[in-house]
């Protein structure tokens, strides 16, 4: 990528056009925002993306634009961040948009839908496939402006007290699962529960729920799920590349000077890259530790995957038939995904599959 193109999409173009970072000190206003996170501080990666973005914003502006991040519950509960942004309680929030599908299922596209885009594909759709424009158009009714800031990559399929051998094993299962996936699994008999990250462990421990999904090995081990559930399934087909965002109050965002907006976008881009890189760096060792401690790693049976895929497609057809806002984004999203699958199947998947086999047989060892 040429340097000019990179700077444009990283949010730095406006800053460089203005001169340089020290220019902020010459009569620039001091602006302080509060950011409500949906996540606890103990989850240093998913919470840390918001702090990384805030630090970058401060560094770029010479401390003139400061964003203070508050953990879930310090200002509002984790699942009420969008409301706090919308009503002006805080200027911005770092959250997973699919938490708010109760308002409209279309919110899910900001994070992930079952059998959707992976992390790289999501970023491509967001920046170059019309995703950013379509999603922010949808958010206008809520007075929110969204800036991409984080991704976990493909997630694990969750923790279960019993094995999932057939589709029938899903019936009656009380499971903590966020976003649109709960509606899909409900078609197969699962009883979905929406809980914030910090509330999952006690619910599993007390038996209030039978299963729970969160992110992946690094976070899951920190939260101690392996102590209260034995079976760890993969893949998390509902979250192939779930994204996090800075939800900004649109009125406050629009008041920002152009240079501060550019700094905010650059900061979020920094947080986006930092979060994905840290998860990729930390997950392998965490998975090894979990398995060494007795966790039983299991793939979902193909029959279960097939049934879930069928249920997801049915649910999408239902929503498209009755929700124009959903359909507008869904049609664009699916068309983009089809092209991505073609490309990944030709090159990316071929390479990854070969390396997985080569690594297993020792061919990749020195």
Kindly give the residue locations of the regions a language model identified.
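N-terminal secretory/targeting leader peptides
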Residues: 2-19, 24-122, 130, 134-366
């Amino acid at each position: 990528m040429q340097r000019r193109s990179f700077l444009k999409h990283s949010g730095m173009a406006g800053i460089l056009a203005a001169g340089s970072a020290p220019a902020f000190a010459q009569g620039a206003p001091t602006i302080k925002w509060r950011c409500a996170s949906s996540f606890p501080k103990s989850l240093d990666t998913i919470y840390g993306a918001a702090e990384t973005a805030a630090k970058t914003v401060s560094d770029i502006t010479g401390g003139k634009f400061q964003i203070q991040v508050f953990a879930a519950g310090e200002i509002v509960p984790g699942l009420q961040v969008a409301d706090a942004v919308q009503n002006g309680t805080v200027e911005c929030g770092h959250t997973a948009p699919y938490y708010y599908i109760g308002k409209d299922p279309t919110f899910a596209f900001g994070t992930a839908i079952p059998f959707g885009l992976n992390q790289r594909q999501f970023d491509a759709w967001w920046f170059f496939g019309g995703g950013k424009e379509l999603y922010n158009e949808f958010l206008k009714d809520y007075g929110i402006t969204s800036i991409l800031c984080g991704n976990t990559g493909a997630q694990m399929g969750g923790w279960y007290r019993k094995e999932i051998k057939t589709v029938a094993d899903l019936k009656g299962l009380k499971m903590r699962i966020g976003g649109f996936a709960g509606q899909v699994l409900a078609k197969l008999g699962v009883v979905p529960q929406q809980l914030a990250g910090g509330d999952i462990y006690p619910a599993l421990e007390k038996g209030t729920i039978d299963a729970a999904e969160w992110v992946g090995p690094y976070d899951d081990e920190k939260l101690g799920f392996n102590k209260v559930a034995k079976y760890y399934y993969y893949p998390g087909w509902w979250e192939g590349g779930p994204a996090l965002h800075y939800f900004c109050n649109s009125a406050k965002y629009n008041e920002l000077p152009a240079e501060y907006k550019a700094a905010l976008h650059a900061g979020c881009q920094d947080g986006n890259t930092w979060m994905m890189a840290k998860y990729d760096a930390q997950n392998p060792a965490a998975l090894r530790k979990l398995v060494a401690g007795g966790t039983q790693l299991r793939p979902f049976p193909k029959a279960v995957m097939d049934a879930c895929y069928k249920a997801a497609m049915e649910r999408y057809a239902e929503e498209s038939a009755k929700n124009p806002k959903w359909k507008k984004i869904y049609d664009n999203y699916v068309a983009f995904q089809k092209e991505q699958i073609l490309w990944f199947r030709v090159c990316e998947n071929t390479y990854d599959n070969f390396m997985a086999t080569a690594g297993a047989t020792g061919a990749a060892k020195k």
